[in-house]
């Protein structure tokens, strides 16, 4: 749990930097829409932003801010997977996690999303922009962050035995793999030793000098 909380805090810090460049972000999207001759459709998915950056972005400044947005979305997607490893989930936490996974999907339609108070990202847009173009894409990250904070709040109320650190399964697997190699090497030694012992035992049971003829008493027969 501590690991996912720290990961979420790290993403929040990156988002604060991104939020300061919201006007640069929407301007970059506007430039890409012009280059793509796609001025009618709203920005409706993460995949659309990805496509704009790869095919219609001609400015290094625009590319940098678009990449910042996509990187944050990618980290949120990875954090969803980490959440699944913390505990098996309850109906409440599973519902929150499913919402997060849906929102962070590359193809999910986010055009109708609107972040409300205390978020003010939509307020920084003009009415036309907020309604028709960028209201959804600027609302995406803060809405996901809110859901993830709510997930953590519910998860922290669960019994301690239900929770497990995200790093534990990985650490356990690594320690198991690390221990298996020397154990296997050590385990082969007794078998080799036993094999040698069996060979020695069989050899020791053979009569010595078996190639010599049987002993006969002097001048007599057996």
From Swiss-Prot:
Q: Where is this region: Disordered?
A: 164-222
Protein localization: Cytoplasm; Cytoplasmic vesicle, Secretory vesicle, Acrosome; Cytoplasm, Cytoskeleton, Cilium basal body; Cytoplasm, Cytoskeleton, Flagellum axoneme
Assigned keywords, A-Z: Cell projection, Cilium, Cytoplasm, Cytoplasmic vesicle, Cytoskeleton, Flagellum, Nucleus
Q: Which domain of life is it from?
A: Eukaryota
Site for Essential for interaction with INCA1, residues: 117, 119
Has UniProt tagged this entry with the keyword Cytoplasm? yes
For this record, the Gene Ontology CC terms, alphabetical, are: acrosomal vesicle; axonemal microtubule; axonemal microtubule doublet inner sheath; ciliary basal body; ciliary base; cytoplasmic microtubule; nucleus; sperm flagellum
Return the InterPro entries for the record.
SPACA9
Gene Ontology biological process terms, A to Z: axoneme assembly; flagellated sperm motility
**Which molecular function term from Gene Ontology is one that the record holds?**
calcium-dependent protein binding
Assembly and partners?
Answer: Microtubule inner protein component of sperm flagellar doublet microtubules. Interacts with CABP1 and CALR. Interacts with INCA1. Interacts with microtubules.
Its biological purpose is as follows: Microtubule inner protein (MIP) part of the dynein-decorated doublet microtubules (DMTs) of multiciliated respiratory cells and the distal singlet microtubules of monoflagellated spermatozoa. Forms an extensive interaction network cross-linking the lumen of axonemal doublet microtubules.
Q: What is this protein called?
A: Sperm acrosome-associated protein 9
């Amino acid at each position: 749990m501590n690991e996912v909380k720290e990961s979420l805090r790290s993403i929040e810090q990156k988002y604060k930097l991104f939020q300061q460049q919201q006007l640069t972000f929407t301007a970059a999207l506007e430039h890409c829409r012009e280059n793509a001759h796609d001025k009618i459709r709203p920005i409706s998915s993460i995949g659309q932003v990805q496509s704009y950056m790869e095919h219609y972005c001609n400015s290094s400044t625009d590319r940098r801010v678009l990449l910042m947005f996509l990187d944050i979305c990618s980290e949120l997607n990875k954090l969803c997977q980490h959440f699944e490893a913390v505990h098996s989930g309850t109906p409440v936490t599973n519902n929150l996690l499913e919402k997060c996974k849906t929102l962070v999907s590359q193809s999910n339609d986010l055009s109708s999303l609107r972040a409300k108070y205390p978020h003010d990202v939509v307020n920084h847009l003009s009415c036309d922009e907020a309604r028709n173009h960028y209201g959804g894409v600027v609302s995406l990250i803060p809405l996901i962050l809110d859901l993830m904070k709510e997930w953590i709040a519910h998860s922290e109320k669960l019994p301690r035995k239900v929770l497990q650190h995200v790093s534990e399964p990985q650490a356990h697997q690594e320690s198991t793999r690390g221990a298996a190699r020397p154990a296997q090497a050590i385990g082969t030694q007794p078998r080799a030793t036993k094999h040698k012992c069996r060979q020695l035992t069989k050899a020791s049971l053979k009569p010595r000098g078996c190639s010599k003829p049987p002993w006969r008493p002097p001048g007599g027969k057996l």
